């Protein structure tokens, strides 16, 4: 699983998501295929049938702390409460994005000051998110919820 994470998110992602020696729970399908990887703080990733991971908020936080802004989309104060609740991110509210983001990449949505708001799937390229004034930039899968719970 570390190899898949390194391939999908870049070098160091596997160790960030699945540190050696940490007790992780792997939930499997009835056929034995891994479905979810869960840590004490919550779901890290789900393993899709396409062989790629979809991030949980806990996994997004781990990646954000380790990968120095890779696979992130930043938004400002105006959209923060909506994104926290799990609402989608629209291009007009994007204030920054990693240049390497492509459509269908898993991304971490952060506030412009740096804390994690949500995780989801990019619908536009980085250039599209920066240039477009309309359209969905990120299809949010899971919002981080109430900031008091962090």
Q: Each predicted region: which residue ranges?
A:
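N-terminal intrinsically disordered, low-complexity, charge/repeat-rich segments that act as generic
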Residues: 1-49
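Solvent-exposed alpha-helices and their adjacent loops that cap or buttress functional pockets
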Residues: 28-30, 99-102
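Generic short beta-strand
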Residues: 35, 106-108
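Beta-strand/loop-dominated core regions that host nucleotide or nucleotide-derived cofactor-binding catalytic loops
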Residues: 51-95, 101-102, 109-150
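Non-catalytic interaction/Regulatory regions outside core domains
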Residues: 40, 102-105
